[in-house]
């Protein structure tokens, strides 16, 4: 089934995906409902303020410190780099950065994507005849405070760049007159001298300025956003002090089982400011997160829950859970369930994946997420709800390019529990019990005709055994850099 019909079946009001003809989804006719329980709360270690950008009385009090990216940084995960291999195969890569401000109960989610970068601009008739239709370009989206939205997109990718082996990327939508667009990480002052509209992101630094391009008529938008903040990673993807892991295991080094997914920073602390429309948000040690995905296209349908702000727990807690129905490699359209739940807590990662246990879920088309999983030693259970209407977001699709394909909210009410698993499979000692009112929740793809119940119990045993083999491809291939694939 084409992505167009899949998403329309998810929401019959989504009838057009062309970027020049914005969609008109259900949320346009709904007034988001904010539960009376969802109120700002105070976190002693986080400082945040809001002011107008041009206020004379509110001086800039937060000045983030730029640190250049080092080649052997701590907590670096595999697959931090840009995976484009230079071939004309269908390909996209996307990045997601989130900053949460608990005192204001607001989040900012930055989403970047590049599509078919082998073609730096729209395909010519000859290229279409040779390679088939492709959608090209670079997109930047922000889901920000008060569920407002901003999107800037262009079909050319001449000014997009990404580091082959590190989480360093950027794009220039509009250069300062007389200046040359950067093609690598540059200090903040130089970026501001050369880039009028664009962004750059690294593990330690994130800055940019983008303007809404007017293509969105289904959500409340802001005209522009500007930001600068630094980040101190706390969790990568693995135990603190240990070698960090590939989220999807060693097969992620190869173009099979796509799309691939890598959490680059399960948790960090960010300091800086974001100008969002007419407001300025300043923050110190705000919980932050980053992830990425890449490959030929998104899953057929999927769900996702992520949270870094919790009550009732000591220390840093980070949750990432997600799953989907993805196509298996081959000539036939065969799909499998894939999912994971991972919690970083007290310096340790509690990992629940198909190759070390079973993940089960129950998802409504919108508003309810329930996931439980177990491995040899632990059991986890999470439940998330939202009364918010959510905001439709765009994602790179193979059929129609950057198009509305999912729905998100950062106001999810979440309960998370982890127990020790006893010899008979029952729950033992409670390791973690916590809750949040700032979970990010998402559903995507389709069709979503009703509740989706699924699990990973049918994961082939051969695949489970293969994924448990402790292959360190990053180190092995690093001995011969010529053979090390891009991104790894």
Swiss-Prot record:
Its annotated compartments are: Plastid, Chloroplast, Plastoglobule
Q: Which gene encodes it?
A: VTE1
What protein am I looking at? Tocopherol cyclase, chloroplastic
**Annotated pathway:** Cofactor biosynthesis; tocopherol biosynthesis
For the keyword Transport, the answer is no
A Gene Ontology BP annotation from the UniProt entry: response to oxidative stress
- Where's the transit peptide in this chain? 1-76
Which Pfam families does this UniProt record tie to the protein? Tocopherol_cycl (PF14249)
**Kind of enzyme, top EC level?**
isomerase
EC number from the UniProt entry: 5.5.1.24
Q: Does the keyword Isomerase apply?
A: yes
| Coarse class of the protein's main subcellular location | plastid
Q: What does this protein do?
A: Involved in the synthesis of both tocopherols and tocotrienols (vitamin E), which presumably protect photosynthetic complexes from oxidative stress. Catalyzes the conversion of 2-methyl-6-phytyl-1,4-hydroquinone and 2,3-dimethyl-5-phytyl-1,4-hydroquinone (DMPQ) to delta- and gamma-tocopherol respectively. Also converts 2,3-dimethyl-5-geranylgeranyl-1,4-hydroquinone (DMGQ) to gamma-tocotrienol.
Q: Which GO terms describe its molecular function?
A: isomerase activity; tocopherol cyclase activity
One cellular component term (GO) for this entry is:
chloroplast inner membrane
């Amino acid at each position: 089934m084409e992505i167009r019909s899949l998403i329309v079946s998810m929401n019959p009001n989504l009838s057009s995906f062309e970027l020049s003809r914005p969609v008109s989804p259900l949320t346009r006719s709904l007034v988001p409902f904010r539960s009376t329980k969802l109120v700002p709360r105070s976190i002693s270690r986080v400082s945040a303020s809001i002011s107008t950008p041009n206020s004379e009385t509110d001086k800039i009090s937060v000045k983030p410190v730029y640190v250049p990216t080092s080649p052997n940084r701590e907590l670096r995960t595999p697959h931090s780099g840009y995976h484009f291999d230079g071939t004309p195969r269908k390909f996209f890569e996307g990045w997601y950065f989130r900053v949460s401000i608990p005192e204001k109960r607001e989040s900012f989610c930055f989403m970047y994507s590049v599509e078919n970068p082998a073609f730096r601009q729209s395909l010519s008739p000859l290229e279409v005849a040779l390679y088939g239709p492709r959608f090209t370009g670079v997109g930047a989206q922000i889901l920000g405070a008060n569920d407002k939205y901003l999107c800037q997109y262009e079909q050319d990718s001449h000014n997009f760049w990404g580091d082959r082996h590190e989480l360093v990327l950027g794009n220039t939508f509009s250069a300062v007159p007389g200046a040359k667009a950067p093609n690598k990480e540059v200090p903040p002052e130089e970026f501001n001298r050369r880039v009028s509209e664009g962004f750059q992101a690294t593990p330690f630094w994130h800055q940019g300025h983008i303007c809404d391009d007017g293509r969105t008529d289904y959500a409340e938008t802001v005209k522009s956003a500007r930001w600068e903040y630094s980040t101190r990673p706390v969790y990568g993807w693995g135990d603190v002090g240990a070698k960090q892991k590939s989220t999807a295991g060693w097969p992620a080094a190869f173009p099979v089982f796509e799309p691939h997914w890598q959490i680059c920073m399960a948790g960090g602390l960010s300091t800086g400011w974001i100008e969002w429309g007419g407001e300025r948000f300043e923050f110190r040690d705000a919980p932050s997160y980053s992830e990425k995905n890449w490959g030929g296209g998104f899953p057929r349908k999927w769900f996702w829950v992520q949270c870094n702000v919790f009550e009732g727990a000591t220390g840093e807690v980070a949750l990432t859970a997600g799953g989907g129905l993805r196509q298996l490699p081959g000539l036939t359209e065969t799909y499998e369930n894939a999912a994971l739940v991972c919690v970083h807590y007290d310096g340790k990662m509690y990992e629940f994946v198909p190759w070390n246990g079973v993940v089960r879920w129950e998802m409504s088309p919108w508003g309810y997420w329930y996931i439980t999983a177990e491995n040899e030693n632990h059991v986890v259970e999470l439940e998330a709800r939202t009364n918010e209407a959510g905001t439709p977001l765009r994602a790179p699709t193979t059929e129609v390019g950057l198009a509305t394909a999912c729905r998100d909210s950062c106001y999810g009410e979440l309960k998370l529990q982890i127990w020790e698993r006893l010899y008979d499979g029952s729950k033992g000692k409670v390791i973690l019990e916590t809750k949040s009112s700032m979970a990010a929740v998402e559903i995507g793809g389709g069709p979503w005709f009703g509740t989706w119940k699924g699990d990973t119990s049918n994961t082939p045993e051969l695949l489970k055994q293969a994924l448990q083999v402790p292959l360190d491809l990053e180190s092995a291939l690093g001995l011969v850099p010529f053979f090390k694939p891009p991104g790894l």
